[in-house]
Amino acid sequence: MKYFVVALALVAAFACIAESKPAESEHELAEVEEENELADLEDAVWLEHLADLSDLEEARGFFGNTWKKIKGKADKIMLKKAVKIMVKKEGISKEEAQAKVDAMSKKQIRLYLLKHYGKKALQKASEKL
């Protein structure tokens, strides 16, 4: 769970970096205006904005790939946890539990884990009372 939280924090940091824009100065706008021979300052701002879009697209591509990797690892961890819980709870062999988990959809696995951990949290809360 700690690793998932750390990974989620890293993803959020990458998203913030991808969305951040450098401060626009008059000097930069003047250079853009001179390069493109633009008389209007609004056109220079628009062109600079277009130049920034390509950087954002690259960052979004990186963010999307990173998110897919994290999601894949989280799915693998959920599968392993579901197998461990079934072995312990139902008293069956690891191979049988693995076969049951393989037959379940990802949504069913998530629901199974939520039920298990929900009951566990409820038991701990009732013990404290």
UniProtKB/Swiss-Prot annotation:
Keywords: Antibiotic, Antimicrobial, Cytolysis, Hemolysis, Secreted, Signal, Toxin. One of its GO terms (molecular function) is toxin activity. Its main location: secreted. Expressed by the venom gland. GO terms for cellular component: extracellular region. Residues 1-20 form the signal peptide. Residues 21-60 form a propeptide. The keyword Signal applies. It comes from the Eukaryota. GO terms for biological process: cytolysis by host of symbiont cells; defense response to Gram-negative bacterium; defense response to Gram-positive bacterium. It is found in: Secreted. Insecticidal, cytolytic and antimicrobial peptide. Has insecticidal activity against the flesh fly S.carnaria. Has antibacterial activity against the Gram-negative bacteria E.coli. Forms voltage-dependent, ion-permeable channels in membranes. At high concentration causes cell membrane lysis. Both the N-terminus (61-94) and the C-terminus (99-129) of the mature peptide form alpha-helices which probably disrupt target cell membranes. The linker region (95-98) probably derives from a processing quadruplet motif (PQM), found in propeptides of many zodatoxins, hinting at a fusion of two originally separate membrane-active peptides. This is M-zodatoxin-Lt8f. It comes from Lachesana tarabaevi.
